[in-house]
Each structure stands twice: as C-alpha cells, then as structure tokens.
C-alpha cells in the first residue's frame, strides 16, 4: 500500500445540490470519486430519498439504467406516468437492493470509513471536518487509463476495502465496483 491519501469533507451534503457541488470539486480525482460514493452511502443511511439521488450521481453511467422519474420529482409535481423526456437514469435495481439491505442492517456502516471512528464507540462520528483515508497499490492501475482501484480504510474491518472508480463522460470519477464497501463491519 502507498502512503495514505486523505480527503477532507467539511460536512455531509444536506441535499442533492450540495452533493453535486461537492462532487464537482472532489470527483476530479479518483480518490474524490471514491469519497463521493462513501458520502452517498452516508446520505442513504440518513435519508433514503436523498441517498438514492446521491448514489445515482456517485456511480458510473455504466452502472445506471433508464428508469421512471424519481420519487422527489413526483412529489414536486411530475406527471405520474413517465414520458420519454422524464425518464431518468437510476441505479440497477439489484445493486440498489443490496445496498439498501446492507445499510438498513448496519446504518452506522458508512461511518466506519471516517477517520477517528471506532467500533468501541458505536461508530460515533468525530467533530467535522471528516477525513477519509484511501490507498493505492501496485495493482491499482494508472489513473491516466480512466480506471483506478483504491482501498478505503475501514474501522471494524480486517483491512482497507477496495472500490473501483472510472472517469465518466463528464470527466468526473465515479464508482463502478463497490461491493466490498457494503460488507458488514464489527458491531
């Protein structure tokens, strides 16, 4: 493993606009893209609607499918029946179901990726700002290729957990493989 790469986040995004703003700042690097997925998981643990919107923005386009308008659009007056122009990309249902299942079983799981959090304290958050520690290794790949595997430090786990990010069409880095991030941690 390489020297740690530390990404600092002043606070958790409170809404989709704050998430997108932070993403435009952080996801210009592979580690920033990985942290955006961790923040989306944290948002999901707090608020399912916000979390789903953030997850859809944090994952690579190849991991999305066209779906009906999201629930928030419906609440804001969108037509109940989708039209071609209202069909929005959404996460693949199987991916979303697995994430929901894991997070609902351990809502503190996203906190395990924040420096200073420990199982002994019930994964209680430290004071903001929040710091995420990531590493690369000789198998991480070259970011110039548009694909990079990073390893996120995780309290309550045997070691860092891998996440693969890819540069998307808009040049931002987004997660394309994250299953190890949602595996249970020590209670």
Predicted regions and their residues:
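Ser/Thr/Pro-rich, low-complexity mucin-like regions
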Residues: 5, 27-30, 154-160, 167
């Amino acid at each position: 493993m390489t020297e740690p790469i530390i990404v600092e986040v002043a606070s958790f995004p409170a809404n989709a606009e704050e998430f997108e703003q932070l993403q435009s700042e952080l996801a210009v690097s592979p580690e920033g893209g990985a942290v955006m997925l961790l923040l989306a998981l944290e948002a999901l643990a707090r608020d399912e609607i916000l979390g789903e919107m953030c997850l859809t923005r944090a994952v690579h386009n190849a991991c999305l499918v066209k779906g009906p308008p999201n629930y928030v659009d419906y609440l804001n007056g969108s037509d109940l029946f989708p039209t071609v122009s209202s069909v929005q990309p959404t996460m693949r249902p199987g991916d979303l179901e697995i994430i929901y299942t894991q997070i609902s079983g351990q809502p503190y799981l996203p906190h395990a990726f924040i420096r200073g959090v420990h199982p002994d304290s019930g994964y209680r958050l430290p004071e903001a700002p929040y710091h995420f520690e990531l590493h690369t290794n000789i198998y991480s790949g070259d970011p110039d290729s548009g694909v990079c595997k990073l390893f996120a430090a995780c309290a309550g786990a045997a070691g860092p957990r891998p996440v693969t990010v890819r540069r998307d069409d808009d040049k931002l880095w987004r997660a394309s493989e994250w299953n190890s991030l949602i595996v249970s941690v020590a209670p």
